[in-house]
Swiss-Prot record:
GO terms for molecular function: RNA binding; tRNA pseudouridine(55) synthase activity. The keyword Isomerase applies. One of its GO terms (biological process) is mRNA pseudouridine synthesis. Belongs to the pseudouridine synthase TruB family. Type 1 subfamily. Responsible for synthesis of pseudouridine from uracil-55 in the psi GC loop of transfer RNAs. This is tRNA pseudouridine synthase B. Keywords: Isomerase, tRNA processing. It catalyses: uridine(55) in tRNA = pseudouridine(55) in tRNA. It comes from Chromohalobacter salexigens (strain ATCC BAA-138 / DSM 3043 / CIP 106854 / NCIMB 13768 / 1H11). Its EC number is 5.4.99.25. The active site is at 47 (nucleophile). InterPro entries: PsdUridine_synth_cat_dom_sf, PsdUridine_synth_N, PUA-like_sf, PUA_sf, tRNA_psdUridine_synth_TruB, tRNA_sdUridine_synth_fam1_C, TruB_C. The keyword Transport does not apply. It holds the Pfam family TruB_C_2.
């Protein structure tokens, strides 16, 4: 007999404003306990020092979390010049001191220009990437060093917000896998004085923006119904995908794992689309070569909407 899952079957997405000093996993577990949710997962780790947008998926939403993991992100960070730390941020130990040359806004902008577009980054040792099954940060804490291959990432936009004698503030929109700590270190190297970040805040992840976030402390002050009202529908994660409407007969075929003939609205073969029945989200389908659709990832609750 299968063991019954503990907790409440809740579906949806919570936009959490992660507090500083809390790991992403700890923040996830705090929220999961607060909602007494059966199943929950986050969609992209933030460093403990970092704050800001951490989308948390509950229940059926966890099926689609990869779409947010792969999404572009936007961050705001303060870059301190003249000091290099072993972690790339203010939580690490300073391992290099350099005098900071007299820099004006034009000097900084000239350096930033070399880091827009496709760039190569060597991931930091203090990261969750794994080597032989172990996170790199564990090896780093043991004083071990592992050679890491450079990875290609994309900085779509990088704006200089303000600058002072000892540092400057940036807003960066980038592809998945971009390490802002490494970006700051590389910019500091280009300026000839080294650098690390002293603050990092995520402002956007995929379709979600910071103005819709909720702090954990604010959620604690709400009753259960008000907390649940803060959850966004599952399909808000997928607004970048086209949508298709399906009739009851076709939806039943799809829910039984079969292909169905529907109006695919001219979508190309192998396209992924959101599927709806009477405005109720059923999941994702793939357009086949012959104009049919095949089930890709459907909600367990979709059968209720198709009846």
């Amino acid at each position: 007999m299968a063991r019954r899952r503990r907790g409440t079957p809740i579906d949806g997405v919570l936009l959490l404003d992660k507090a500083p000093g809390v790991s992403s996993n700890r923040a996830l577990q705090q929220v999961r306990r607060l909602y007494d949710a059966q199943k929950a997962g986050h969609t992209g780790t933030l460093d403990p020092m970092a704050t800001g947008l951490l989308p948390v998926c509950f229940g059926e939403a966890t099926k689609f979390s990869a779409y947010l993991l792969d999404a572009d992100k936007t961050y705001r960070t303060w870059v301190r010049l003249g000091e290099v730390t072993d972690t790339g941020d203010a939580e690490g130990t300073v391992i290099e001191h350099h005098s900071v040359p007299a820099l004006d806004e034009r000097d900084i902008e000239a350096a930033l220009a070399g880091f827009r577009g496709e760039v190569e980054q060597v991931p930091p040792m203090y990261s969750a990437l794994k080597h032989q099954g172990r996170p790199l940060y564990e090896l780093a804490r043991e004083g071990k060093h592992v050679e890491r291959a450079a990875r290609r990432v994309t900085v779509y936009d990088m704006r200089l917000l303000s600058c002072e004698a000892e540092g400057f503030e940036l807003e960066v929109r980038c592809s998945k896998g971009t390490y802002i700590r490494t970006l700051a270190e590389d910019i500091g190297h280009a300026l000839g004085c080294g650098a690390h970040i002293t603050s990092l805040r995520r402002l956007r992840s995929g379709p979600f923006e910071a103005d819709a976030m909720h702090a954990f402390s604010a959620l604690e002050d709400l009753d259960a119904a008000s907390r649940e009202a803060r959850l966004l529908p599952v399909d808000t994660m997928l607004t970048h995908l086209p949508s298709l409407e399906v009739a009851a007969s076709a939806s039943r075929r799809l829910l039984h794992g079969q292909r169905a003939q529907i109006d695919t609205a001219g979508l190309a073969a192998q396209s992924t689309a959101r599927l709806y029945r009477d405005a109720a989200f059923l999941g994702l389908v793939t357009v086949t070569e012959c104009g049919e659709v095949a089930p890709r990832r459907l909600l367990n609750t979709a059968s209720l909407a198709s009846e």
